Amino acid sequence: MTSPLCWAAATTTVTSPEQAPAPSSKAKGSKVHRSKSMGRAQAWPAHHPKSATSFHAMKSSVHAQVLELQRKIQLLEGDRKAFYESSQWNMKKNQDTINQLQEETKALHVQLKDLLQGDSKVIQAIIQEWKSEKPFLKNRTCEQALEHLEHQLREKMNQLNALRHQVILRQKRLEDLRLQHSLRQLEMAEVQDSNMEAAKTMRNLENRLEKARMKAEEAEHITNVYLQLKSYLQEESLNLESRLDSMEAEVMNTKHEVQELKVVNQEAINARDIAKNQLQYLEESAIRDRKKREHYITDCKKRAEEKKLQTERMERKTHRDHVLLQSEDTIQDHQRHREEELRQRWSMYQMEVMFGKVKDATGVAESHAVVRRFLAQDETFTQLENLKKDNELALAKLKEEKQRLQRELENLKYSGDATLVSQRRLHEEMQKTFKKEEQRHNDVHERLEHTSRILQLVKDCLEHLANKLSHVKLDDTVLAGKKLDRDSEDYAYNLLVVVQEKLLKLQDQLESQDVPELLRHIADREFLATLEGKLPLYNTRILLPVASVKDKFFDEEESEDDDRDVVTRAAFKLRSQKLIEARSKKRNRLRRS
């Protein structure tokens, strides 16, 4: 270092001659100090070694003092930075403490303000909670507001006590009314016990009348349902056969089209496979040709590299000999003679190498035989030239044929792809059409099954109704004495006609009868039947002679048998539900198979 402090320390320090010179890299790097020391060394005479030793010792001591001063300066700088950081941290801590104390002071000021304004705060809080008391508490103190609120509280307590007293009085009144109601109920029970027989008779009559009305309404409803079914079946029977025939024809046509499309699809797949095989064969042949060419090229390159290496070796050898010859500058004549000899040797060596190659190529050891062989090779050379030209022409033709086949392959590839795409699109369209037709066929099949179920249900209902009306005889109709065939197609229609005529005949017979009297007679019989059903098993019933004439339309035994044979609505629904479930299970099994 070249600071004035260092130079002053160097001038004031006394060095001892026994210290060994140990200059550091920093002291050696000082330009000014080096120049002065060099100047002094040059100025001193060469026969004073002790003065040079003292100079080096002084130089090393100065350098040690400089390092010590630098170390002290670094320590002072570190102390200064630590003191600065600690002071900054203390300032930050004091600032945080000041901010906290300011916030606490603000909070204490707010509390003091609230304490000074306590009455107004309390009144404002009361006004916000009870806005209805605002005009009474607006300009009052806290004590006045509390007195006012206590007064209102006392009034509300008085009102509450008055309401409680009214509630107690009304509860007592309610208990009295309940007691009176229980007494009235006991009186009504006594009156009802006295009139129980008449009330029971009235209830039984009302029940029988209601049952008769319900049966009449049910019969009307069944008649309307059968008429609707008859009209619906007549309409369906007109169009069902033609629609089924047309649907079957459409299904057959669709199947034929699907078979044709399958054949076309198989042909397209076969053509695609053939094209793929041809393309693969051409690609493999092209790869083999390319590999052959690459192998031939690599062989040629290897031979060329070998020739090149041989020539380089020969050139290096000649160059080395030439350099050795040129290094002998003293013997020029010998050099010329040496050069001529080397040229001759080199020419002889080249001739030997060439002759060896010719011998290797021709397989002849003598020179005159080699000459004869070369003369005989003229005709062979001409033949080889002709063969080369022919091979070049054949190669050109083969290249043209290859290009033509490549173009045909590209055309076939693109045309085959286009044909395949069109065939796929056509196949997808036909698949969609087939799915639509199959869906329509399934819908028609479901409708047919539904219609057949309805027809079977109608047949069962008509047979049941015909069995009920078997006592009604038809005289002036075509189907009166004719027995209906159950397996015939017109069985349901003929049975419906018979049932309709019987119902019309019954309706005509009922018009001439007294309907209220018949209903009363039915109700009496039902009442007696219910009484008999309630009797215990050990009770013996004594039949009294009946003076009234039996009605031919309401035989008791016949009506009981009919009631046993009548299918209720719940049983009818259960039977139809079982039939639908069986059909659906059968359809699911067919679809899965």
UniProtKB/Swiss-Prot annotation:
Residues 10-50 are annotated as: Disordered. Keywords: Cell projection, Cilium, Cilium biogenesis/degradation, Coiled coil, Cytoplasm, Cytoskeleton. Residues 28-37 have a biased composition (Basic residues). GO terms for biological process: brain development; cell morphogenesis; cerebrospinal fluid circulation; cilium movement; cilium organization; determination of heart left/right asymmetry; determination of left/right symmetry; epithelial cilium movement involved in determination of left/right asymmetry. The keyword DNA damage does not apply. Residues 84-317, 378-449 form a coiled coil. Disruption phenotype: Mice have a spectrum of laterality defects, including complex congenital heart defects associated with heterotaxy, and airway epithelia show largely immotile cilia with loss of the outer dynein arms. GO terms for cellular component: axoneme; centriole; ciliary basal body; cilium; extracellular region; outer dynein arm docking complex; sperm flagellum. Its main location: cytoplasm. Pfam families: ODAD1_CC. It is found in: Cytoplasm, Cytoskeleton, Cilium axoneme; Cytoplasm, Cytoskeleton, Cilium basal body; Cytoplasm, Cytoskeleton, Microtubule organizing center, Centrosome, Centriole. Component of the outer dynein arm-docking complex along with ODAD1, ODAD2, ODAD4 and CLXN. Interacts with ODAD1. Interacts with PIERCE1 and PIERCE2; the interactions link the outer dynein arms docking complex (ODA-DC) to the internal microtubule inner proteins (MIP) in cilium axoneme. Component of the outer dynein arm-docking complex (ODA-DC) that mediates outer dynein arms (ODA) binding onto the doublet microtubule. Involved in mediating assembly of both ODAs and their axonemal docking complex onto ciliary microtubules. May be required for motile cilia function. This is Outer dynein arm-docking complex subunit 3. It comes from Mus musculus (Mouse).
